[in-house]
Design a protein with these regions (language model features):
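Short, amphipathic C-terminal "tail helix"
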Residues: 210-229
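Amphipathic alpha-helical interaction segments
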Residues: 52-53, 72, 123-126, 224
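Conserved nucleotidyltransferase catalytic core and NTase-mimicking acidic/glycine-rich helix/loop elements
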Residues: 91-214
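An N-terminal structural lobe/cap that precedes and organizes the functional/catalytic core
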Residues: 1-94, 101
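Glycine-centered secondary-structure boundary/capping sites
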Residues: 23, 154-157, 225
Length: 229
């Protein structure tokens, strides 16, 4: 089976991510599509296993096999967790809807470390841009601020909301370069501190609910095998 066929024929969940999902789209913004496919169980009985992810077949499209998606989500991967909370769902079959119903099972206090570590990587790139070019890439600075806001609010409330809502304009001001870098930098530092404070008393559980996720994955694999019998 061609990798593209796994996406076209076996997708269980598809959504739009990026600026459009974050409420930060402007004229000319790309449409970034993300999805989850369920590789038929018999494909795992071969020496050559199905891929864990597939790029395409459309432009700006990327999909994960369900098991890999769940593994990354259980580790608190920011990109994966945000996919499960996109406000722009394009498709979800019965299995995809069950995955969405499980999304809170992936949230735990460890997201503080994974989100902030991811943010630190982006921050280093911005600092390098400032040293080399005298200014950051403002679009990247905007998205870093958004990510830190999301992490802080998740730790405070226990709920992951990725649409920036009424913070849109203040973030777009950063994208347009209307906020001096020292001020943007100060906002980032403040958000990191606030996320750390929120982590100490977060309503999130200490660990994700691996048992629920594993039960879902096992039942899904079994059902796929029975359909192929």
């Amino acid at each position: 089976m061609r990798p593209e066929s796994l996406v076209t024929d076996h997708t269980i969940y598809a959504c739009v991510m990026g600026s459009r999902a974050f409420g930060l789209a402007t004229e000319g913004s790309d449409t970034d599509r993300r999805g989850v496919f369920l590789a038929p169980t018999p494909l795992f009985w071969r020496f050559e296993k199905p891929p864990t992810h597939v790029e395409g077949p459309a432009d700006e499209q990327f999909s994960w096999e369900l098991e890999r998606f769940c593994e990354l989500a259980l580790r608190g991967n920011p990109n994966i967790l945000e996919c499960l909370h996109s406000p722009l769902v394009e498709y979800a079959d019965a299995t995809g809807r069950e995955l969405l119903a499980l999304r809170d099972a992936f949230l735990f206090r460890g997201v503080h470390e994974t989100f902030v570590r991811y943010a630190h990587g982006r921050r280093r790139k911005l600092d390098a841009d400032v040293r080399t070019h005298g200014a950051p890439r403002w679009k990247h600075a905007m998205h870093l601020l958004r990510l830190l806001m999301t992490a802080r609010d998740l730790l405070r409330t226990g709920a992951l909301t990725i649409d920036v809502g009424d913070r849109r304009e203040e973030l777009l001001e950063v994208r347009r370069g209307e906020v001096p870098w020292p001020e943007a930098e100060a906002r980032m530092n403040r958000l990191v501190r606030e996320a750390e404070e929120a982590a100490a008393r977060s309503p999130l559980p200490q660990e994700p609910d691996r048992r629920r996720v594993e039960d879902f994955l096992t039942r899904t694999r079994r059902a796929s095998a029975l359909r192929a019998a």
